[in-house]
From Swiss-Prot:
Lineage start: Bacteria, Pseudomonadati, Pseudomonadota, Gammaproteobacteria, Enterobacterales
Species the sequence originates in: Escherichia coli
Miscellaneous comment in the UniProt entry for this protein: Type I restriction and modification enzymes are complex, multifunctional systems which require ATP, S-adenosyl methionine and magnesium as cofactors and, in addition to their endonucleolytic and methylase activities, are potent DNA-dependent ATPases.
EC number assigned by the record: 3.1.21.3
Gene3D superfamilies reported for this sequence: 1.10.10.2110, 1.20.58.2040, 3.90.1570.50, P-loop containing nucleotide triphosphate hydrolases
Chain residue ranges for the region called Motor 2 domain: 470-702
One biological process term in Gene Ontology: DNA restriction-modification system
Descriptive protein name: Type I restriction enzyme EcoR124I/EcoR124II endonuclease subunit
Annotated catalysed reactions: Endonucleolytic cleavage of DNA to give random double-stranded fragments with terminal 5'-phosphates, ATP is simultaneously hydrolyzed
Length: 1038
């Protein structure tokens, strides 16, 4: 990377390197897990780590004592050390979050020694990182619910902060991830475990190495949140040898642990990704080098960061702002956002990262007051407030101070008047912009581009990088044009023609709006993965071109849903909300910019305002809220709505401009578009859908009711490169059905139909899979089926194919209805009939077999029969997320019992059908006996409807739960009160754990030293685990 300014020594200290030459492979011979471990330890020792042998908690504590004494220049006597340990270092009541807080926030302890002198005892020296002692231990054994051996642990000042889990080359890396997951449940967090201090996990199979934060947050625990290390050009560093030579350099690792991790106020530990660190480092380097050269207030003294939407810009900009405040020559850091709503969101986000370091300002006077305070160096403000302040105040002390400006999404009104004022008023500033969509000459409306205002690009991480690293998802774009009479209108791209009044009216033709609304209602559940009873799936947004369009759609949805509810008592309407306001006629800075809607509703015309009032009243009556269109009430409505979209309380949100930029909701997977989008606006709007969430969310679904194909390709080419189209856009339906070659990797991917036919040929009867090799082959093949089906269910063509399986082909009325609903002509209909999908029953049987093998494999593993096995299961990953997404809930199963009974099917046949269903469901397998007993012991004819069956089942299950709990307590001779308390807690959290003391308190009086104690504890624990699996979700008293 060439830098134009004076280079200072600091620039060579980047931890994300510009250059790195890969290590040569040391040999081609087979490398076992222990070989890999030996090599890693040797490499770390060569890099200056000290290897020590520590095998017990007490030895680990003794080492911590020695390291902290050296670091702090003190000596503890035994009673002082005991006091320090019990009160602070390893307080028995500390959980994992308390320990993390001690590394990030409370890392200095004011300790009073026996002779009454007070000393600051540091756990870690954050000012001078290289003073911290780094050591390694291996194969430390920790007792917990299961004794676990940890591969390699890195200690900092004696405390275990990094855990490395290795698997031999060729093993699926997810295996190592799952193992860490198991440890954190079983023993990292057992009482008095210093392993609660762990900050960072590193997993590797030699070929692929990833790191991730130790967090208890379930959504951040997914494998998708693991990351590779990388160079500054985003080339990944995957091999363990290369990872060790770069990320495990002592200076680098300590920086990641201390400077590039954040423990936020929602108590989530976040560790930054390499591109976030690289950008932050380069901003700090630029500020320092410009200051040294006295070269401020010019484009050369700043720069911009191009990081794609959804890649975590807020965390990066926060860290850059936070670390800039620590430079002693900087007086203030302004974090400037563009809109009122973003101001609030950024304040919330910033406060999440660090509650004390941010001053928001309600208005310009508030901003002025904040400038006078010395205690906080970071100020969050909007460009509008900053501009008003500069216009109103000709002389402020801050104008002559050393100031850093960081602009979030730096491409809007900052280009205008505010920039001129800023350059006039501030004498010594360094200005940086973050953007996901820079303005280049190609998409600029005037002469100004991102680079001409902010200076050169300091770091980039574009959408192709993010998709390759699986940090954002691809887009699947449907150009939906099934309305022949509106075709010429929907394919028009000439802006002048589009804005002509008669065309605007034609877009709002009631027939067109009704057809599109009906399409959305028909396809909503399929697009948002809600086709299975009880599945939560995702939610969606509809972006429309004007306030009139929003009104028309909202009213049409309401009418069509009311009509459907009148026809069917079981119809469940979608929960729909809308928000829009007045968009001031501001000049655009770039082609395709989404015009900015303000929170000022007073400028709206009266009919739009009345309509919005009515929509908000409906929202209020549903959610028991009290919002309105007056300015404060409207702002609060915006905030409440944003939260409810994130929580999935809203199914579909209709918007004009708001929420299409800067709004982040990982549960949103579909955007319906009836407006013309281009360049920046298109990328911003599409990016609402492509946040990673879990394995069921494979891409962002975009369904456009106008022809945006050319605009889409133009936008992704501008913000990526010429090959971006192949990376950013999902493959076609035909490619997934028939197979394709991946352009990026050159790998041939089999089509869905090939997988189906192999499945049916090799495993016609899933109940007869006997040998271990057959089991493994089946699991791999059915896993491939689940992954392909999960992707295909987003395609309309696949939904049509599945719908065809459900109709009676001998019924001409049903056939004609099907053709009309799915826009299928005779030729297409004949073609569809040639494609055969496996019957639903067959898939249920396959799912049961898959679940059975998973259970069997877990039992085998626990019994450690693996030693004798000749089949290597290491490269098999069970697709648990995909199974869960198609869960069938208990209410559905009970409804089925009611239907079967009404059709006078015998109990024997009914029980077989119910067993098949339950076994194919991951969450309800343990309830099989309970449901079967219920059928056998209940006179179903006495129950008149579905609701009574559900009530009767829960009454029955609660009675059984009570009876079995008492029997278990008696049989195992447990302490009754403690056992009931422990069972109640476990039922509430839906799993049993051996962490903490709750389980021990239930056991009969036996000394923990008695050899039978451990056996007894294990036996009781296993029985309670089965009990919880069987009765969770049943309710009732214990």
């Amino acid at each position: 990377m060439t830098h134009q300014t004076h280079t200072i020594a600091e620039s060579n200290n980047f931890i994300v390197l510009d250059k790195y030459i890969k290590a040569e492979p040391t040999g081609d011979s087979y490398q076992s897990e222990s070989d890999l471990e030996r090599e890693l330890i040797q490499d770390l020792r060569n890099q200056g780590y000290e290897f020590i042998s520590v095998k017990s908690q007490s030895a680990m504590l003794a080492n911590v004592r020695e390291q902290l004494q050296n670091l702090n220049g003190v000596v503890f006597n035994d009673s002082e050390w005991r006091r320090f340990t019990e009160q602070y270092l390893d307080n028995p009541s500390d959980g994992i979050l308390d320990k993390t807080r001690k590394i990030h926030i409370d890392y200095i302890c004011d300790f009073i020694f026996d002779d009454e002198r007070l000393e600051n005892i540091y756990l870690i020296d954050k000012k001078n990182l290289m003073r911290n002692k780094v050591q390694i231990i291996q194969q430390f054994e920790q007792a917990g619910s299961h004794a676990n051996r940890y591969d390699v642990t890195i200690l900092v000042n004696g405390l275990p902060l990094v855990q490395i889990e290795l698997k031999k080359r060729g093993v699926a890396i997810r295996e190592a991830f799952n193992q860490i997951h198991r440890y954190s449940k079983e023993s990292f967090n057992s009482e008095n475990s210093l392993f609660k201090y762990l900050q960072l996990f590193v997993i590797s199979n030699g070929t692929d190495t990833r790191y991730f934060a130790n967090t208890t947050k379930r959504d951040k625990n997914s494998f998708d949140f693991t990351m590779n290390w990388a160079k500054s050009d985003n080339t990944l560093i995957k091999d363990l040898k290369d990872f060790t030579a770069t990320c495990f350099q002592k200076h680098t690792l300590l920086n990641v642990l201390v400077n590039y991790s954040v423990f936020d106020s929602s108590q989530t530990l976040l560790v930054m990704r390499p591109y976030q660190i690289a950008a932050t480092e380069r901003i700090l380097w630029k500020i320092k080098s410009s200051f040294t050269a006295k070269n401020w207030s010019k484009p050369e003294s700043g720069g911009y960061i191009w990081h794609t939407t959804g890649s975590g810009k807020t965390l990066t900009s926060f860290k850059a702002a936070r670390l800039a405040t620590e430079l002693d020559f900087i007086d203030k850091v302004f974090f400037v956002v563009d809109r009122k709503d973003l101001d609030y969101q950024t304040m919330k986000e910033y406060q999440r990262f660090s509650p004390d370091s941010v001053n928001g300002s309600e208005n310009t006077a508030g901003l002025k007051r904040n400038l006078d305070k010395d205690d906080n160096k970071i100020i969050v403000t909007t460009i509008q407030k900053l501009n008003n302040l500069m216009k109103a105040e000709s002389d402020l002390p801050v104008y002559n101070q050393q100031v850093v400006f960081i602009f979030d999404e730096c491409h809007r009104s900052q280009f205008g008047e505010a920039q001129k004022n800023l350059k006039k008023k501030f004498k010594r500033y360094y200005q940086f912009g973050f953007t996901g969509t820079p303005i280049f000459p190609e998409n600029a409306l005037g002469s100004e581009t991102t680079a001409s205002v902010f200076g050169r690009e300091l770091h980039s991480y574009v959408i192709t990088d993010a998709i390759r690293d699986e940090k954002v998802l691809k887009f699947k774009v449907d150009y939906n044009d099934v309305r022949p009479q509106f075709k010429s209108l929907e394919t028009e791209t000439d802006e002048k023609k589009l804005s002509a009044a008669e065309n605007q009216q034609a877009f709002l033709h009631p027939m067109r709006i009704q057809e599109i609304t009906q399409y959305i209602l028909n396809n909503f559940r399929q697009k948002t993965h809600r086709t299975f009873p009880g599945s939560k799936g995702f939610n969606a947004m509809l972006a429309v071109s004007s306030v009139d369009a929003a009104k028309a759609y909202y009213a049409t949805f309401k009418r069509l849903q009311e009509e459907a509810a009148n026809k069917s008592a079981t119809y469940k309407p979608l929960r729909i909300a809308t928000i829009f306001s007045f968009a001031a006629n501001e000049e655009q800075n770039a082609i395709g910019e989404i015009s900015d809607e303000t929170f000022d509703t007073s400028a709206m015309d009266s009919s739009a305002k009345e309509f919005l009032d009515a929509a908000i009243r409906e929202y209020n009556s549903h959610f028991k809220t009290n919002f309105s269109t007056d300015s404060n009430g409207f702002q609060n409505y915006y905030r409440d709505l944003a939260q409810r979209v994130k929580n999935q309380d809203i199914d579909l949100l209709i918007v004009v401009g708001m929420f299409l930029t800067g709004f982040d909701a990982p549960t949103l997977n579909t955007l319906f578009v009836d407006k013309n989008l281009r360049y920046h606006g298109l990328m911003q709007a599409f990016s609402r859908t492509n946040r990673i969430y879990d394995a069921t969310k494979t891409f962002g679904n975009i369904v456009t009711f106008r022809d945006l194909e050319r605009s889409t390709i133009d936008a992704i080419t501008l913000f990526g490169d010429k090959n971006t189209k192949n990376v950013v856009l999902e493959k076609s339906y035909t490619e997934y059905m028939e197979g394709f070659t991946d352009a990026a990797t050159g790998e041939a991917k089999r089509g869905f139909m090939t997988v189906v036919s192999e499945l049916e040929q090799r495993f016609p009867d899933p109940t007869s899979i006997e040998s271990e090799k057959e089991k493994k082959d089946f699991v791999k093949l059915f896993g491939e089926y689940l992954r392909a089906e999960n992707i295909l269910q987003n395609y309309d063509e696949f939904a049509t194919l599945k719908a065809l399986q459900q109709i009676d082909l001998s019924d001409p009325v049903a056939v004609e209805k099907f053709k009309a609903e799915h826009y299928v002509d005779d030729e297409k209909f004949a073609e569809l009939q040639t494609i055969r999908l496996p019957a639903d029953r067959k898939i249920q049987d396959y799912r049961s077999a898959y679940n059975d093998i998973r259970d069997w494999q877990r039992r085998e593993k626990e019994a450690e029969k693996k030693e004798k096995s000749t089949t290597d299961w290491d490269d098999v990953v069970f697709e648990v997320d995909l199974l869960k997404s198609q869960e069938i809930n208990l209410d559905y199963i009970l409804g089925l019992i009611f239907e079967h009974n009404r059709q006078n099917k015998g109990k024997g046949e009914m029980i077989e059908e119910v067993k098949r269903l339950i076994r194919s469901s991951l969450g309800n397998r343990a309830k099989e006996g309970l449901v079967v007993d219920f059928i056998q012991q209940t006179n179903l004819d006495d129950l008149p409807d579905k609701a009574s069956i559900i009530d009767a089942f829960f009454t029955f299950a609660q009675r059984e739960q009570q009876r079995e709990a008492e029997a278990l307590i008696k049989e195992e001779n447990l302490n009754e009160d403690a056992a009931k308390r422990y069972i109640r807690t476990s039922l509430k959290r839906e799993y049993a754990t051996e962490n903490g003391t709750e389980l021990n308190e239930t056991l009969p009086k036996l000394s923990p030293l008695n050899p039978q104690y451990k056996t007894k504890k294990q036996a009781v624990f296993q029985k309670i685990v089965s009990f919880i699996e069987k009765f969770k979700g049943v309710g009732g008293k214990i």
